[in-house]
Design a protein with these regions (language model features):
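Hydrophobic beta-strand segments within beta-rich accessory/binding domains
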Residues: 55-61, 71-77, 120-124
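Exposed aromatic-hydrophobic patches
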Residues: 58-60, 106-114
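Short carbohydrate-recognition loop motifs
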Residues: 44-49
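Noncatalytic modules at the cell exterior or secretory-pathway interfaces
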Residues: 112-131
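Short beta-strand segments within Ig-like beta-sandwich modules, predominantly Fibronectin type-III
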Residues: 99-103
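Surface-exposed ligand/attachment interfaces on beta-rich extracellular proteins
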Residues: 27-38, 50-67, 93-95, 127-130
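Short, surface-exposed beta-strand/strand-loop-strand elements in extracellular ectodomains
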Residues: 67-98
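Short, intrinsically disordered N-terminal pre-domain segments
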Residues: 1-32
Length: 131
């Protein structure tokens, strides 16, 4: 059985009056089971150099992705400029996607995704700086 885990740790000694450390681990499983993930569409890297909203994930282009499965999405802004950002959204680029986050240089996000929703994952860069 495959075992895939996602872990986050956020430590800080000066964010509050006392030191803070938050840590959490999730074991990723196949939808509706205790079985580890057995499928992946793989990892892909895309270089963005446009300030035009773009589909990062177009659900219609992914075979078998319309079923209610346990999908996870990881997005990272590999840029180093802290004044440039990517706005990540859910929805159709011909409409108004719902913004779910803004990733500055070095930022990342990991979120569950319902492929059954038919909604795409979009990216809108703050400018045409390649990242």
């Amino acid at each position: 059985m495959a075992t895939t885990t996602a872990q986050i740790t956020i430590p800080s000694s000066d964010i509050a009056d006392n030191a803070v450390s938050i840590s959490n681990t999730a074991t990723l499983t196949t939808a509706g089971t205790a079985t580890g993930l057995t499928e992946t569409t793989g990892l892909a890297r895309r270089k963005m150099a446009s300030s035009t909203i773009t589909d990062l994930i177009t659900i219609a282009n992914i075979a078998g992705f319309s079923a209610a499965k346990s999908a996870k999405v990881y997005i990272r802004n590999t840029g180093t400029l802290t004044d440039k950002y990517a706005i990540i959204g859910i929805g159709d680029i011909t409409g108004t996607p719902t913004t779910i986050g803004r990733l500055y240089g070095g930022d990342w996000m990991f979120f569950p995704y319902d492929g059954n929703s038919g909604e795409d994952v979009t990216i809108d860069m703050s400018d045409a700086t390649a990242t």
